């Protein structure tokens, strides 16, 4: 049986999609952090105007009062699973497909980075220890000592790469993106950020198929200007990361994204000064990296540069579109 790949995103990445020679100058990335549509009160998670659409196309202003009205999924027990599936299997192919009159040719890469709660995070870092009571044994009544869940601000990242900044408008200004892709975002996401970043690939990926990423969102120490923070992150901190033996052992890709502006009003994304993304072969490799003595030195360096609002978490990677092979380190 021959599989029909019509309109599938397989056609937009290897081995089916065509690729071009790598680019060595810093690329431009719209590092779009997303939070999913769900019944969380707006007091706990902000919501973009017009998002969280109902089946009738209207914004559900108070989703915690009317979760059943959400177009994506009205059953709260299925809300996360349905959202995770929709983003990858429905929204991703819509973004990648060139409908008549549109072209995504200037999108060099589109990666979806889905946060996974079981992975390490700044809210619950490894090592993970067995819980014990005063008697040194496991709790006899575990129902009374369930740890609270620390929820990161974002549920994932749309990592969209362009050769130059003007290409963003050339792509997103098309009717397909400006109308129908935005409409689809309003079904799936309660908020998306709009920051533009300059990408520095410090450790290139061999195949750009590394399954797991550690995403570090940096908000600078208030004593530093954004310019000074970004300079020190790239010129001082990044060489420290690269120089650790644990990085050599575990890290398959390392990129730093420096915020240089936004495509539109961006109250949440504008707070982010930079993002570090380190990719790994497995979730256990992330855990082992974070508990290494080498990473302790990295964490101390980060702590001196960053401030309130910084967070990190682990995610699963999906390469939806990729036109660049092989990946190479950025020349500076």
Explain the meaning of each model-derived region.
Residues 2-332:
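Macromolecular interaction modules
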């Amino acid at each position: 049986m021959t599989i029909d790949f019509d309109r599938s995103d397989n056609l937009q990445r290897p081995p089916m999609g065509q690729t071009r020679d790598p680019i060595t100058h810093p690329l431009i990335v719209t590092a779009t952090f997303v939070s999913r549509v769900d019944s969380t009160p707006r007091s706990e998670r902000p919501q973009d105007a017009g998002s969280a659409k109902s089946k009738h196309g209207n914004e559900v202003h108070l989703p915690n009062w009317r979760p059943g009205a959400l177009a994506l999924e009205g059953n709260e027990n299925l809300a996360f699973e349905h959202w995770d599936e929709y983003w990858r299997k429905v929204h991703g192919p819509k973004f990648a497909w060139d409908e008549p009159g549109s072209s995504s040719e200037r999108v060099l890469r589109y990666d979806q980075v889905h946060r996974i709660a079981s992975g390490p995070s700044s809210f619950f870092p490894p090592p993970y220890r067995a819980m014990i009571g005063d008697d040194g044994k496991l709790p006899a009544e575990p129902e009374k000592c369930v740890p609270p869940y620390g929820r990161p601000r974002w549920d994932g990242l749309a990592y969209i790469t362009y050769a130059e900044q003007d290409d963003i408008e050339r792509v997103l200004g098309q009717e397909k993106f400006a109308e129908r892709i935005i409409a689809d975002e309003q079904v799936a996401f309660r908020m998306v950020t709009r920051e533009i970043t300059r990408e520095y690939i410090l450790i290139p990926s061999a195949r750009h198929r590394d399954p797991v990423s550690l995403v570090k969102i940096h908000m600078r120490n208030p004593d530093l200007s954004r310019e000074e923070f970004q300079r020190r992150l790239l010129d001082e901190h990044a060489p420290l990361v690269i120089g650790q033996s644990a990085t050599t052992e575990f890290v398959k890709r390392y990129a730093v994204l420096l915020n240089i502006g936004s495509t539109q009003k961006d109250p949440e994304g504008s707070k982010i000064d930079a993002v570090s993304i380190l990719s790994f072969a497995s979730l256990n490799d992330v855990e082992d990296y974070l508990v290494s003595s080498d990473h302790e030195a990295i964490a101390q360096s980060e702590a001196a540069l960053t401030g309130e609002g910084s967070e990190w978490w682990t995610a699963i990677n999906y390469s939806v579109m990729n036109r660049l092979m092989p990946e190479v380190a950025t020349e500076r």
